[in-house]
């Protein structure tokens, strides 16, 4: 058997390959750090109070807007204060997005991909009211209506996008105590999430119906101010991200085809590690596929869910591969038989599968429902928020435990190698140099694997926390920089690209020789090669199991010869 390219590649060629890949890794970090803006931006929109039109409250195709021809007349705070009922059932809170800047009308770009809206409310109670302290987890009923229009539409040509009667729970605390009223500020609450930002302008109308028989909105005094924070992906970051995908996608596809052709040339069935490498490359290619270009022409509200599914498949495959990769290099194995997923790794991989399925179910409950109702959120109820928070914490803890377990497996591999290195002095010089070179290369690759795993787990945990930052009420400042995101994404591609090259079968063939002659010839080859620092590790004849792809995995089955 000729072994893998990792074993047969000369030291000089290997150094050139590793240096080139490291330069590509640095380039990925620099692209994100120097050319890409921050991944997400936001606008803070103050709700404009408009007087509702009598008889149109139940007309879901009717919208009030605050800018342009035919804009509504805003209601002043003093008018609300002087009204005995605080203009209950007469007010509409209007949010028109995006806001103008420097007297220029801005519009959303399809490069911005998605839009998330969260609310922060200030409510007030009269000082003379018997109910001065709002109850814990105050329930609020909101009539939410979302509309859109495009650049060439008239100012009044708003088209309905979504409508829903939503319930939200407020957690408020006193902010100001005055003679007339007590002002309470409430924690942010999620309102809507759009998986596609296909239109130029969006309009949000909020009504807070008060109904005594149905006991709607009777426990809070009156709305004082409402602030909407509209969060969107930055278009410049999307362009850099898609550029990376467009460049990396054909490279990974090409190296996969090259790898599988070399495997099929061999007179044996592919080994487990070769299958896993192919599946890993396929999952990465699915992630690299720049489907986001379609959103520039078509409205695809399911793109967020599809992106989560693609990333989930890649995570599941990557985590599974690392367990198999470390396990296949365990030099002391329980069984000499050929490894299979079912025989050796079902316990390890079942935990990964269960974790990924749990996150998938959670994602379906959130973003799957948002395909029908963008105002739906699992975070809206106290129980749902606790369940969602538990999922995020559990996912983060599981990722940390996985990384520790992977470190343990790598340590065990290194320990096995250390135990077997004691037999190297009894080997011939050729065999000893052969295995010392393999061990050095393998250790370097395993350390690179640990580094990749550590950054992946860190990125996963930070991503989960950053996504939930606007949905739970903790003062956590997390900003995933563009350099970190592009760097980790490039690292995945470079790491898998390197594995497909280094673990591809080597087709160098060496003449068969008698056992007595082969030792002498091997020693001469090693000494001559060492002098020029161009050691070729395939010069050693091998009688290993043809189902093994690496000489290192059959180290314990070798018999030293002189």
From Swiss-Prot:
Compartments in which it is found: Presynaptic cell membrane; Postsynaptic cell membrane; Cell membrane; Endoplasmic reticulum membrane
Subunit architecture: Interacts with wg; in the Golgi. Interacts with Vps35, a component of the retromer complex; wls stability is regulated by Vps35.
InterPro entries xref list: WLS-like_TM, WLS_GOLD, Wntless
Family named by the database record: Belongs to the wntless family.
Main location: membrane
Identification of the protein by name: Protein wntless
UniProt KW Endoplasmic reticulum keyword: yes
Glycosylation sites: 58, 103
A GO BP annotation: Golgi to plasma membrane protein transport
Biological source species: Drosophila mojavensis
Recorded GO MF terms: Wnt-protein binding
Keywords: Cell membrane, Cell projection, Developmental protein, Endoplasmic reticulum, Endosome, Glycoprotein, Golgi apparatus, Membrane, Postsynaptic cell membrane, Segmentation polarity protein, Synapse, Transmembrane, Transmembrane helix, Wnt signaling pathway
One annotated Gene Ontology cellular component of this protein: endosome membrane
Membrane topology annotation: Multi-pass membrane protein
Biased composition (Polar residues): 539-556
Task performed by this protein: A segment polarity gene required for wingless (wg)-dependent patterning processes, acting in both wg-sending cells and wg-target cells. In non-neuronal cells wls directs wg secretion. The wls traffic loop encompasses the Golgi, the cell surface, an endocytic compartment and a retrograde route leading back to the Golgi, and involves clathrin-mediated endocytosis and the retromer complex (a conserved protein complex consisting of Vps35 and Vps26). In neuronal cells (the larval motorneuron NMJ), the wg signal moves across the synapse via the release of wls-containing exosome-like vesicles.
Keyword Transmembrane helix in record: yes
Regions of this protein lying in the Cytoplasmic compartment: 1-13, 261-270, 333-344, 412-441, 504-562
Lumenal side: 35-239, 292-311, 366-390, 463-482
Parts of the chain that traverse the membrane: 14-34, 240-260, 271-291, 312-332, 345-365, 391-411, 442-462, 483-503
Stretch forming the signal peptide: none
């Amino acid at each position: 058997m000729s072994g893998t390219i990792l074993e047969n590649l000369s030291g000089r060629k290997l150094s050139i390959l590793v240096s080139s890949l490291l330069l590509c890794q640095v380039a990925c970090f620099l692209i994100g750090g120097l050319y890409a803006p921050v991944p997400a931006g936001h606008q803070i929109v103050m709700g404009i109070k408009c007087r509702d039109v009598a008889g149109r409250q139940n007309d879901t195709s009717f919208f009030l807007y605050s800018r342009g021809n035919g804009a509504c007349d805003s209601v002043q705070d003093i008018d609300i204060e002087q009204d005995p009922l605080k203009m209950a059932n007469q007010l509409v809170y209007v949010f028109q997005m995006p806001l103008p800047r420097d007297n220029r009308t801005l519009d959303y770009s399809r490069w911005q991909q998605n839009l998330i809206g969260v609310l922060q409310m200030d409510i007030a109670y009269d000082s003379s009211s018997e109910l001065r302290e709002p109850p814990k987890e105050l329930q609020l009923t909101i009539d939410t209506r979302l509309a859109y229009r495009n650049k060439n539409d008239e100012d009044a040509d708003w088209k309905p996008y979504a409508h829903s009667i939503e319930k939200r729970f407020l957690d408020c605390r006193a902010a100001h105590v005055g003679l007339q009223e007590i002002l309470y500020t409430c924690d942010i609450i999620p309102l809507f999430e759009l998986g596609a930002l296909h239109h130029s302008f969006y309009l949000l109308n909020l009504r807070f119906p008060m109904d005594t028989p149905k006991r709607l909105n009777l426990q809070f005094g009156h709305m004082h101010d409402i602030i909407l924070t509209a969060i969107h992906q930055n278009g410049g970051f999307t362009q850099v991200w898609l550029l990376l995908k467009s460049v990396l996608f054909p490279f990974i596809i090409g190296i996969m085809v090259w790898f599988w052709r070399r495997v099929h040339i061999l007179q044996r069935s592919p080994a487990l590690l070769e299958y896993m490498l192919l599946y890993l490359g396929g999952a990465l290619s699915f992630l690299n596929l720049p489907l986001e270009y379609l959103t520039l022409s078509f409205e695809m509200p399911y793109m967020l869910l599809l992106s989560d599914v693609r990333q989930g498949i890649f995570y599941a495959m990557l985590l599974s591969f690392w367990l198999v990769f470390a396990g296949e290099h365990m030099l002391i194995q329980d069984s000499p038989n050929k490894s299979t997923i079912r025989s050796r790794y079902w316990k390890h991989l079942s935990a990964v599968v269960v974790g990924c399925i749990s996150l998938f179910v959670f994602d379906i409950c959130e973003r799957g429902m948002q395909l029908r109702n963008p105002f739906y959120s699992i975070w809206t109820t106290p129980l749902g928020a606790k369940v969602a928070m538990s999922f995020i914490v559990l996912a983060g803890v599981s990722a940390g435990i996985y990384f520790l377990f992977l470190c343990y497996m790598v340590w065990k591999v290194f320990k096995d190698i250390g135990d077997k290195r004691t037999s190297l002095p009894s080997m011939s010089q050729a065999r000893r140099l052969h295995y010392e070179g393999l061990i050095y290369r393998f250790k370097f690759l395993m350390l690179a694997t640990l580094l990749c795993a550590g950054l992946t787990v860190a990125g996963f945990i930070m991503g989960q926390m950053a996504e939930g930052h606007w949905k739970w009420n903790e003062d956590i400042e997390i900003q995933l920089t563009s350099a970190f995101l592009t760097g980790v994404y490039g690292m995945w591609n470079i790491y898998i690209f390197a594995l497909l090259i280094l673990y591809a079968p080597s087709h160098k063939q060496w003449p068969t020789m008698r056992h007595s002659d082969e030792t002498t010839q091997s020693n001469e080859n090693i000494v001559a090669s060492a002098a020029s620092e161009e050691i070729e590790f395939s010069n050693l004849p091998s009688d290993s199991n043809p189902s093994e792809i690496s000489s290192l995995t059959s180290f314990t089955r070798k018999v030293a010869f002189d």
